Amino acid sequence: MARRYWNINLEEMLEAGVHFGHGTRKWNPRMAPYISAKRKGIHITNLTRTARFLSEACDLVFDAASKGKQFLIVGTKNKAADSVARAAIRARCHYVNKKWLGGMLTNWPTTETRLHKFRDLRTEQKTGGLNRLPKRDAAMLKRQLSRLQTYLGGIKYMTRLPDIVIIVDQQEEYTALRECITLGIPTICLIDTNSDPDLADISIPANDDAIASIRLILNKLVVAICEGRSSYIRNP
């Protein structure tokens, strides 16, 4: 896999607060190689390491996108949800940004059944089919559709398991990460100083609580995916 230039610079990461970790009492000792200092009771992430692993992740997603691979971006906490949706839509990726339903990947047949139901209900709504039902039945199906939209709206076009999963906040999305590990799906994780860097295929040490930090990391990955997709379109 060829290395490329992704315009990752330390000043930009400093401005976004990528270097701020968790309090020194809330840390995982395995993160020691990725921490450069302690300041006012918090750990400071080594941004040189961040840049290195972010660059490796960009190389990986570019290469995968250039081969037509599918991506899933996961980030369900409030500070990540909007950034995840925007990044995924921009890069034409699937996403989960509300709640991870246990077994979403490991019990794929059940997820697939839910997606079929979701698509059927959307079609019924668009064609006016729901309005022709008795009010009670229509109300029940509309509530069901609303719930499916909330939890499955970001994966409504997913027809198979993703090739790569990008996870914002390893701690928050641990269930999703374990499912990927079980299935052998490669993962890229944004990890803070309280995480285990050995669980993902590529771990990017960074502040997973600041919106600006999350947005910056996702933006770099999105640019790489989009460039890879363009390469795939030009050379299918």
From Swiss-Prot:
Keywords: Chloroplast, Plastid, Ribonucleoprotein, Ribosomal protein. GO terms for cellular component: chloroplast; mitochondrial small ribosomal subunit. The keyword Plastid applies. SUPFAM superfamilies: Ribosomal protein S2. GO terms for biological process: translation. It is found in: Plastid, Chloroplast. Pfam families: Ribosomal_S2 (PF00318). GO terms for molecular function: structural constituent of ribosome. HAMAP family: Ribosomal_uS2_B (MF_00291_B). Belongs to the universal ribosomal protein uS2 family. This is Small ribosomal subunit protein uS2c. It comes from Gossypium hirsutum. The lineage of its organism: Eukaryota, Viridiplantae, Streptophyta, Embryophyta, Tracheophyta.
